[in-house]
Amino acid sequence: MTPQTEQELLQRAQAIAGLRFAELAQSLHMPVPPDLKRDKGWVGMLIETALGATAGSKAEQDFAHLGIELKTLPINAQGMPLETTFVSLAPLTQNVGVSWENSHVRHKLSKVLWILVEGERQIPLSERRVGQPILWQPSAQQELRLKRDWEELMEYISLGKLEQINATLGEVLQLRPKGANSKALTRGIGKHGEMIDTLPLGFYLRKTFTAEILQQFLLGTG
C-alpha cells in the first residue's frame, strides 16, 4: 500500500529504522542476495517495497502524489556517505528550452526522503541495518549551487562538448556515464552539431554534498 500522506510515509520509514536487511526482506518475502555484485539496486528496491514507492526508475518522483523522491544513502561507521547519489539521466538531445526550473534534476530534488543504510562491505548484506530517515528540501543557497552546476554541465551537452565532460566538473553535481556497459549507447550531439552515438550520462550528487545534508540534519538545522 502506498502511503497517502507525508506523515504516514515518515512513520513507515521510522518503523523500519534499526531493522537488519534480512529481517525486513523476510517480512516482505524478498530473497536476500549474497552480495550486491549482481544486484546493485537491491537495497533501493528493498526500501522502495517496504515504503510502498511506485515510480521505479520513471522520471516522476517515487511518491509523486506527495511530491517526494526516495533515496537510499549507504554510509560508513562514521556516518559519512560511501557513494555518489544518482539523480536522473541527462537529456542529451531535444534539450532546447530546458531550464533549471523545469528540469528533472530540480523536480527530483525538490523534496527528498533520505533513508540511511549501513554500507560497509565487511558487514554481510543480510546483517546491515536500515538507519534513520531524513526528509530534506534544498535551502535557497543549496538550490543556487545545484542550479549553477546544472547550467554549466548542460552547456557542455548543448554545445556538443561531450568529450570534454568529466567527473571533476561541478561543485555539488557531476555528470558521469550511466549504463551497465559501454555497449549501452544513446544519441547525443557532436561538436559540429551532428548526431552521434554516445554513452548515456547521469547527474549525480557528490558525496560532499550529501555529507552536508547529513550534517545539517545532525545539527538540527535541516
Swiss-Prot record:
One of its GO terms (cellular component) is cytoplasm. InterPro entries: DNA_mismatch_repair_MutH, DNA_rep_MutH/RE_typeII_Sau3AI, DNA_rep_MutH/T2_RE_sf, Restrct_endonuc-II-like. It is found in: Cytoplasm. One of its GO terms (molecular function) is endonuclease activity. One of its GO terms (biological process) is mismatch repair. Transmembrane segments: none annotated. It holds the Pfam family MutH. Keywords: Cytoplasm, DNA damage, DNA repair, Endonuclease, Hydrolase, Nuclease. Sequence-specific endonuclease that cleaves unmethylated GATC sequences. It is involved in DNA mismatch repair. Belongs to the MutH family. This is DNA mismatch repair protein MutH. It comes from Pasteurella multocida (strain Pm70).
